[in-house]
UniProtKB/Swiss-Prot annotation:
EC number in record: 1.18.1.2
Binding residue positions for FAD: D35, Q43, Y48, A88, F122, D289, T330
UniProt-recorded name of the protein: Ferredoxin--NADP reductase
Native species: Ehrlichia canis (strain Jake)
Leader sequence residues: none
Classification of source organism: Bacteria, Pseudomonadati, Pseudomonadota, Alphaproteobacteria, Rickettsiales
UniProt-listed InterPro entries: FAD/NAD-bd_sf, FAD/NAD-binding_dom, Fd--NADP_Rdtase_type_2, Ferredoxin-NADP_redctase_2
Length: 338
């Protein structure tokens, strides 16, 4: 039994996946989008919704959330079907269409598959702290969705990479107290950010707790009131008053079942024809960070271009008897609005 029938099944609801919906729609092709996360936006939503992005054409500066909101709005006229919180587990090839089965048991019939999965399905690396699950999504978070929610709060950030350092700088602007806890004395971040942390520490805006690690969370009913940290050298323990904890230890990602789809993969990227973005398997395309070819530049704008190239090639599969007459959007407008 088929739950959905579509022209293109897009795997991945990040910026490139959403833009694929728009490009397909401009060519009168319908899309169904599958993503492991419960919200669209990929890493832009999950990891840096409020961090600035500077290299999107036409935007001197744009946040991850704003970019995703605008991409969704741009694609809305084409009525995409989003299947979130699930992964594409299995595909069956029936010569002129695929059946795609998701981890929730949903079956999609699609003429073509476009993989826009970035680095694959991913999630945060959870630190090995007892009872951390009791606090997750209440006072322990792995991303900052709305910075204003943490105004005048006592915040602890754990980690020493770019995400930890960047958010320490940003949240120090609105926090009552900001602690950053790291096992090492040096941060593995951009030199300019490390300098900012040093200056903010000297001015009392950030409390740098090194070389320490989190030992225990204290609170009740999911609400933190303090965190115990331990010195990794002399094992001294300190209890700090904390309202919210952000463990930033990176994310882990994998291609999962896609490794078994008969697609040529090199270093967790799919080799594609750079003119069409077709993979080694007919009617399966890859765009964005997951796609690789000689000279590939891993930028969001590169993925946008790849989405356009792939959709123009896919058109001939979806409409084999209808020639594609290229038109600029200024000439033809938005198909479903005319």
């Amino acid at each position: 039994m088929t739950d959905y029938t579509t022209d293109i099944a897009v795997i991945g609801a990040g910026p490139v996946g959403i833009f694929t919906v728009f490009q397909a729609g401009m060519l009168k092709m319908q899309c169904c989008v599958i993503d492991a996360l419960t919200e669209v936006g990929g890493q832009c939503t999950a990891l840096y919704p409020e961090k600035p992005i500077y290299d999107i054409p036409g935007y001197p500066i744009v946040s991850g959330k704003e970019l995703i909101d605008n991409l969704k709005k741009q694609s809305e006229p084409f009525n995409p079907q989003y299947l979130l919180g699930q992964i594409a587990e299995k595909i069956e090839d029936y010569s002129d269409y695929f059946l795609i089965r998701t981890s929730k048991g949903i079956v999609i019939q699609s003429k073509v598959i476009v993989i826009a999965a970035g680095a694959g399905a991913f999630g945060p690396n959870r630190p090995p702290i007892d009872n951390i699950l009791d606090y997750e999504n209440k006072s322990v978070f792995y991303q900052v969705k709305n910075i204003s929610d943490f105004h005048n709060k006592n915040i602890m950030i754990a980690g020493g990479g770019d995400s930890a350092a960047d958010w320490a700088v940003e949240l120090s602007k609105i926090a009552s107290q900001l602690y950053i806890v790291h096992r090492r004395r040096n941060f593995r971040c951009a030199p300019n950010t490390a300098l900012q942390i040093d200056n903010l520490s000297q001015n009392g805006k950030i409390n740098v707790i090194v070389p320490y690690q989190i030992k225990k969370l204290l609170g009740e009913e999911g609400k933190l009131h303090s965190v115990v940290v331990q010195n990794i050298t002399n094992h001294e323990e300190i209890t700090l008053q904390v309202d919210y904890l952000f463990p930033f230890f990176g994310t882990s990602a994998n291609l999962g079942s896609m490794l078994n789809w008969g697609i040529e993969i090199k270093g967790y990227q799919m080799t594609v024809d750079f003119e069409t973005c077709r993979t080694s398997r007919d009617r399966i395309y890859a765009v964005g960070d997951i796609a690789t070819y000689p000279g590939k530049v891993k930028l969001i704008l590169t993925g946008f271009s790849e989405a356009a190239m792939a959709c123009h090639h896919i058109y001939h599969i979806v409409y084999p008897n209808s020639p594609l007459n290229f038109q600029y959007s200024t000439s033809k407008g938005i198909p479903n609005k005319n």
